[in-house]
């Protein structure tokens, strides 16, 4: 009796559906760097603002760290080895408002990449969940930008 070969079955389904499953590790190094940078920046920004804004940024940092861990896990499971983690970004003295604007653009880019990967047969649900959280981060960034006092 022959055992089920998952790799052979996947190749057959790809031919039947005339699709090729994208390599989930392709481009992950860039996403890993983005999530690492965002997690560090949100934590840094949480120390520069007060009250509920600080708590929101701390929570966003924790969620970005979770995304980072998931991406590293996918990278490792796919046999790509351990991903290279970039060195922490230097402290940025740019205004909070300007940094939040930059973060919004980066969150939108990550959102687009996660949504594009959401149809992956093995990791699609993970990418869809991270896309949903990135969408929420975009909303939170807009609220934070709208609630900041005018800069002097």
State each model region's role:
Residues 1-152:
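Non-heme di-metal
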């Amino acid at each position: 009796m022959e055992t089920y070969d998952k790799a052979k079955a996947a190749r057959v389904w790809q031919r039947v559906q005339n699709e090729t499953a994208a390599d989930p590790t392709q481009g992950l190094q860039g996403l890993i760097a983005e999530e690492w940078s965002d997690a560090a920046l949100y934590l840094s920004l949480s120390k520069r603002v007060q009250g509920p804004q600080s708590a929101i940024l701390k929570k966003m940092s924790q969620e970005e760290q979770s995304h980072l861990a998931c991406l590293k896990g996918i990278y490792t499971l796919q046999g790509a080895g351990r991903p290279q983690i970039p060195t922490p970004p230097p402290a940025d003295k740019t205004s909070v408002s300007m940094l939040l604007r930059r973060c919004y653009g980066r969150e939108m880019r990550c959102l687009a990449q996660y949504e594009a990967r959401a149809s992956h047969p093995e990791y699609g649900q993970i990418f869809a969940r991270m896309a949903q959280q990135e969408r929420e981060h975009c909303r939170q960034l807009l609220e934070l930008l709208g609630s900041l006092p005018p800069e002097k």
